[in-house]
Each structure stands twice: as C-alpha cells, then as structure tokens.
Amino acid sequence: MERNKGKIITVTSTKGGVGKTITTLNLAGVFSNLKKKVLVIDFDLYGGAVATYLNSKNDKTIFNLITDLSNNKYKNIDDYIYNHNEYISILSAPKDPRFANKMDSKYIPIILNNVVYKYDVILIDTTHILNEINIYTLDMSDIILYLFTNDSFDLKNTKSFLTILKDAGFNN
C-alpha cells in the first residue's frame, strides 16, 4: 500500500527558551492521539532535548546519519530512528554540540525525502540560530510555526526573520 506524503511542520524561533521543544512534543502527542504516525526530528544541534524528554535509548543520532551519508555507509534511515511508541518516533540531535558544525546541510533534503512518505507528520524542532540547516528545513516545510515572546528584542528579531524569509522567496 502506497502511503500519502506526510506534512512537514517546523517549529522555530529566533530566541531560545520560548518553548519550541515542548510545543513540538505536545504536537507529537496530539497527532499520536489522532492515530497519526509522527516523526520528530531534533535539529536543535547545539542542545537538542527531544531524546532526553522521550527517554530515547538510541545511540545513533542525526550526526551519525549525515556522517554515514557522506561516507557512503548509509543503508536504511530506520537504523537511526528511535521508536518511542506505536505512533511517535524520533531522530535525535547529536549528543555532543561540537558535532553541530561538522554536519553538511546538503543532506537535509535527502533525509526529509527519505521520511516524508513513511510518516503522516514530520515535526522539526530547530535551534534559534538561522543557519543553513534551518533554511533547508524551512524551505521543505508545509507549515512553519514561529514562536516569539512579547519583548522588544524578540519583536525586532521576528521582523528580521520575516524579512529574511520574504527575501528568500517564502511568500506565505
């Protein structure tokens, strides 16, 4: 049976500590209650907490996946994914933030294209830094949830973020 293309939803912000991870995990819970198969990808490469919150036992992370892709050792994306329960699976951020700068963003579309037909919903938790990896995830997203607080610094960053998206060709 062929599966429909899943929806990619990215939860992002230009500020840390606004609840991106909690929002992502709450959405995973909502979709799983609707019997939707969900993959949570933790692209907060400098301090991802999804694996910690879900008590992941998987030793392989997105860093291992990208390393194996770049060294032609990749076989199956399922080898890197931890199944939390019947409906929620995760692809964890690196355990060591020093690996974040060693990850080649060109593999992000390959990763997302490998999972988009395996899951009903792909939820992406990002870092607050607008880097190449975040640009790729935003570009491939069906829905972008941008979280912000009501302070002048964050509002200024939100305006800059929206300008960057508009300049990059994001219209909606």
Give the positions of each predicted feature.
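Acidic-aromatic/histidine active-site loop/patch
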Residues: 1-8, 163, 167-169
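Short loop/turn elements that form and flank the Walker-type P-loop nucleotide-binding site
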Residues: 5, 34, 84-85, 117-118, ...
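Short, glycine/charged-enriched secondary-structure capping and boundary segments
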Residues: 26, 53-56, 104-106, 136-139, ...
